[in-house]
């Protein structure tokens, strides 16, 4: 992409919607949060329309598609319903994620290698509509090869195992896996993003990795916003990332 920026921040607004849905109120508004995040330095807005609609609702997607000034990164499962919504809404980016993510925390990313035809079909349909497709995968060479073969121009490396590591040694091992995966993905010509579980305390090593394009971060920013305010929480994360990326 070039430009002066060395790394980009995608702010995930799912948990603004979680807070709203807890009481089925009209506030806090994910749309308002997204627009404020943009003014605070977010380079894109990420939202996950789940099949159970537990946080983001269809109306949020529709309104945000019309109002965002940056780009929308719509996370979704690889189902006919979701593909239909994406093709109708036409966000700039779609990130395909595991169907039941909460039950797959140990596995993390999509098994692209195990469902190559399905992934190739989804990538082709979205790509033909002018949507840039990203696949959310583990830091695994076989999955990177499969993502490349499926025709996805972008991958998002799952950083959850790194974030959740119980010891320094385990974290160092996970970090090395991610580092190698980023380098390998770049060698295949893929744009490599990363996300899941990133916080103000663990983001900088990932942001400093050569070849990382964008980090998608949500929960940590929403939590920090309780204490410092939403715009400051977004700006603070962006500052940490840019400082690390040099």
Swiss-Prot record:
Pathway: Cofactor biosynthesis; pyridoxine 5'-phosphate biosynthesis; pyridoxine 5'-phosphate from D-erythrose 4-phosphate: step 5/5. GO terms for cellular component: cytosol. GO terms for molecular function: pyridoxine 5'-phosphate synthase activity. 3-amino-2-oxopropyl phosphate binds at residues 12, 23, 197, 218-219. The active site is at 48 (proton acceptor), 75 (proton acceptor), 196 (proton donor). 1-deoxy-D-xylulose 5-phosphate binds at residues 14-15, 50, 55, 105. The keyword Transcription does not apply. Its EC number is 2.6.99.2. Keywords: Cytoplasm, Pyridoxine biosynthesis, Transferase. One of its GO terms (biological process) is pyridoxine biosynthetic process. CDD domains: PNPsynthase. It is found in: Cytoplasm. It catalyses: 3-amino-2-oxopropyl phosphate + 1-deoxy-D-xylulose 5-phosphate = pyridoxine 5'-phosphate + phosphate + 2 H2O + H(+). The record marks 156 as: Transition state stabilizer. Homooctamer; tetramer of dimers. Catalyzes the complicated ring closure reaction between the two acyclic compounds 1-deoxy-D-xylulose-5-phosphate (DXP) and 3-amino-2-oxopropyl phosphate (1-amino-acetone-3-phosphate or AAP) to form pyridoxine 5'-phosphate (PNP) and inorganic phosphate. Belongs to the PNP synthase family. This is Pyridoxine 5'-phosphate synthase. The gene is pdxJ.
């Amino acid at each position: 992409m070039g430009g002066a920026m060395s790394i980009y921040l995608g702010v995930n607004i799912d948990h603004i919607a979680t807070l709203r849905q807890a009481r089925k109120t009209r506030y806090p508004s994910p749309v308002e949060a997204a627009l404020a995040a943009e003014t605070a330095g977010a380079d894109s807005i990420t939202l996950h329309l789940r099949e159970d609609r537990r946080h983001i609702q269809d109306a949020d997607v529709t309104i945000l598609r019309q109002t965002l000034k940056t780009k929308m990164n719509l996370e979704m499962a690889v189902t006919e319903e979701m593909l239909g919504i994406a093709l109708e809404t036409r966000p700039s980016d779609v990130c395909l994620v595991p169907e039941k993510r909460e039950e797959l925390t140990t596995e993390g990313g999509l098994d692209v290698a195990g469902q190559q035809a399905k992934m190739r079909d989804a990538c082709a349909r979205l790509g033909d509509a002018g949507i840039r497709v990203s696949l959310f995968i583990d830091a695994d060479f076989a999955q990177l090869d499969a993502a490349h073969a499926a025709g996805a121009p972008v991958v998002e490396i799952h950083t959850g195992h790194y974030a959740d590591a119980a010891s320094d040694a385990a974290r160092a091992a996970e970090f090395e896996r991610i580092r190698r995966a980023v380098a390998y993905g770049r060698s295949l010509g893929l744009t490599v993003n990363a996300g899941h579980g990133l916080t103000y305390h663990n983001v900088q090593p990932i942001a400093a990795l050569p070849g990382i394009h964008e980090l998608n971060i949500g929960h940590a920013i929403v939590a920090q916003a309780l204490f410092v305010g939403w715009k400051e929480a977004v700006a603070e994360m962006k500052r940490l990332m840019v400082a690390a990326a040099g």
